[in-house]
Each structure stands twice: as structure tokens, then as C-alpha cells.
Design a protein with these regions (language model features):
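Conserved phosphate-donor/acceptor-positioning beta-strand/loop module used by diverse small-molecule
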Residues: 143-146, 154-180
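A glycine- and Lys/Arg-enriched "phosphate-lid" helix/loop adjacent to the NTP-binding pocket
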Residues: 165-166, 174-206
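PAPS/PAP-binding and catalytic site of the sulfotransferase fold
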Residues: 20-34, 154-159, 226-251, 277-280
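Gly/lys/ser-thr-rich phosphate-binding loops in alpha/beta enzymes
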Residues: 1-55
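PAPS-dependent sulfotransferases, especially Golgi type II membrane carbohydrate sulfotransferases
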Residues: 1-17, 103-119, 179-189, 206-209, ...
Length: 318
């Protein structure tokens, strides 16, 4: 990016998986000037190495958007890109180690310029954002990578005007959702999104919440917004308007009605299978856990997550 260019606005969405972030990204991609990249952290693993499909159905190297982004981002020709992408992935994994996460979170304001892994990931993320903005003309990029330390990396980048949306969902609902597999179709091929056991889901929900609370100390309050999934589902248009206000982008709402929006093909590079959804969509609350989740499991989740549940306004049932 040229130093004379205006900064790119980036909204990092943090939170636990199965919290509606991909649907939210699809909605925001309908706003003029917005580009939802999905979980950008997976671009090099799932996009380059595994060639998983973009939201448009094409592999990233065949996608009209991501193929150009990769050409501008990676320094090697296609035959050697796997090695370059592998180095980025290895650095990402190093930053994700539990012993390194706090250090990454503290680097949100900059610094640690001698940490090779962090420097490599910063360079890759910054180049990808700049290239995506140039290719698509987006002035706002929505990144739903969800992990707080990925958002910290984004916050430290020069020429990025960084914002954070912390999406929370009742951990009982998250645990129940992860026990249900999701099947979707890409180019006529059926694919399944796997399940996760309750203890693993609880650990990740807790780690996500704690990481977000730590990240919040490093981000100006004027650039931070917390939103509950349940509140969003009750009044989605109002909450999307709140997000636009946070970003200083009071553009027209993409909603046709208070709870309905028409989604078009997008270029979300990684995320929940809902990124392949097109057409009219009604936003509805999924609270099946209330009737389908065993009381014992609800109690276990509550015991493990009670402090953050109370902080986020969730009532304990047991």
C-alpha cells in the first residue's frame, strides 16, 4: 500500500465458533464498499495448500478475486507457492501456541519487531488486506477469523484502521450446536462440517471469552463493540446499523425487512457452510438447546463457564 493512500478499515470479529459470525459476514458483504473475507487466517492453509472452495464455489487460485489477491500477496510463482504458504502456516501455528498467545495479544499496539513468526504473519495479513482492498475496491474489510490473537495481529498493522466486534453466544447453545453436524453442497458435491465434544467446546468458548477480555485492554473503547448472538437474532437490522455506526459507515441497510436480507454470491474464503447460502434469508434465533440438550450437560457447561456467562448477561438455569 502506498503511504499516501487512506487507511483500510478492518473489522475483526472475535468469538466462539457457531455464534453466527459467518451469516453476519455474508450480511455485511451486501453493504456498499464492504468486503467480507471470512476467516482470513485460513487463506494459506485451506485456500492455498488445501484449495478449499471460496464462497463463490471456486478454489481460491481460480476465483476471480482471490487469484488476484494471491498473485499480489505471495512473492513466488504458483509452483512454489505451497512452500511459501507452508512457512506462513507454520508461523501462525507458533503464534497460536498457548504460551505465546498473551504475548501476541500484548503486541496489538505494535512492537515485537524481532519476533520472526509474528513479523511473517503480520506481513502476510497486511499484504492480503491491501491486495483485497485494491482488487475489490472495498474500503471496509470484515475478517471473521474469531481468535482474539489474530485480531491483535491485525490491530498492529500500519495503514489499518482497526475495529473489533466481539460476538458472544450462550455457551450451552454453542455446545449443543457443535454436537450437530452440518451438511452442505458445493458444486453438487455433498460436504459435512464435523462435530466437537462438549469438553473441547467449553474450553474453546472460555479461551475465546478470556482472550477477548484481554484484547479489549489493547483496543480503544471507541473501536470496540460487543454483541450477543441472541440479541442480534431478535433485531438483526438494528444491530447491523450499530456495527455500521461503530465503523463510521452509516450507509443504507442491506435488509429488506427488519429480519430479512437477500444474500448474493460472495468471496468468503473460509468459514461456516452458511457462506454458500444465496437468496432471501430470514434471521431466526436457534435455541434448540433449551429443549434438546440434556440437563446434565447444561449443568456441566454452566459450572465451567459461569463467570463469563454472568458477565455477558446469561442466566444460569441450574
Amino acid at each position: 500500500m502506498d503511504e499516501s493512500d487512506p487507511p483500510i478499515k478492518v473489522l475483526s470479529v472475535v468469538g466462539a465458533g457457531r455464534s453466527g459470525t459467518t451469516v453476519l459476514a455474508s450480511i455485511l458483504s451486501e453493504v456498499d464498499g464492504f468486503g467480507s473475507v471470512g476467516e482470513l487466517r485460513w487463506l494459506w492453509q485451506r485456500g492455498v495448500l488445501e484449495r478449499r472452495p471460496c464462497g463463490c464455489g471456486e478454489a481460491p487460485d481460480k476465483c476471480p478475486v482471490w487469484s488476484r489477491v494471491l498473485d499480489a500477496t505471495l512473492t513466488t510463482a504458483p509452483p512454489e507457492r505451497r512452500e511459501e504458504a507452508s512457512k506462513i502456516v507454520a508461523s501462525q501455528r507458533r503464534l497460536a501456541k498457548p504460551r505465546n498467545r498473551w504475548r501476541v495479544l500484548r503486541s496489538a499496539r505494535g512492537g515485537d519487531d524481532d519476533w520472526e513468526a509474528l513479523v511473517r504473519v503480520r506481513s502476510a495479513m497486511g499484504a492480503a488486506c491491501s491486495a483485497y482492498s485494491r482488487v475489490t475496491g472495498s474500503r471496509v474489510i470484515v475478517d471473521t477469523s474469531k481468535r482474539p490473537f489474530d485480531a491483535a495481529v491485525m490491530a498492529s498493522l500500519p495503514h489499518i484502521e482497526h475495529y473489533v466486534l466481539h460476538v458472544v453466544r450462550d455457551p450451552r447453545a454453542v455446545a449443543h450446536s457443535w454436537r450437530r453436524s452440518k451438511t452442505f453442497s458445493v458444486a453438487g458435491e455433498a460436504r459435512t462440517m464435523g462435530t466437537r465434544r462438549l469438553p473441547a467446546t467449553v474450553r474453546r468458548w472460555w479461551a475465546s471469552g478470556l482472550g477477548a477480555e484481554l484484547l479489549r485492554r489493547e483496543v480503544p473503547s471507541s473501536r470496540w463493540l460487543r454483541m450477543r448472538y441472541e440479541d442480534f437474532c431478535v433485531s438483526p437490522r438494528e444491530h447491523v446499523d450499530n456495527i455500521l455506526s461503530l465503523l463510521g459507515e452509516p450507509g443504507p441497510s442491506p435488509f429488506e425487512a427488519a429480519d430479512r436480507v437477500v444474500l448474493h454470491h460472495n468471496h468468503i474464503v473460509a468459514g461456516n457452510p452458511s457462506r454458500f447460502t444465496v437468496g432471501a434469508v430470514k434471521i431466526e434465533l436457534d435455541d434448540a438447546w433449551r429443549s434438546e440438550m440434556r440437563t446434565r450437560d447444561q449443568h456441566l457447561v454452566e459450572l465451567a463457564t459461569a463467570p463469563l456467562m454472568r458477565r455477558y448477561g446469561y442466566r444460569l438455569r441450574h
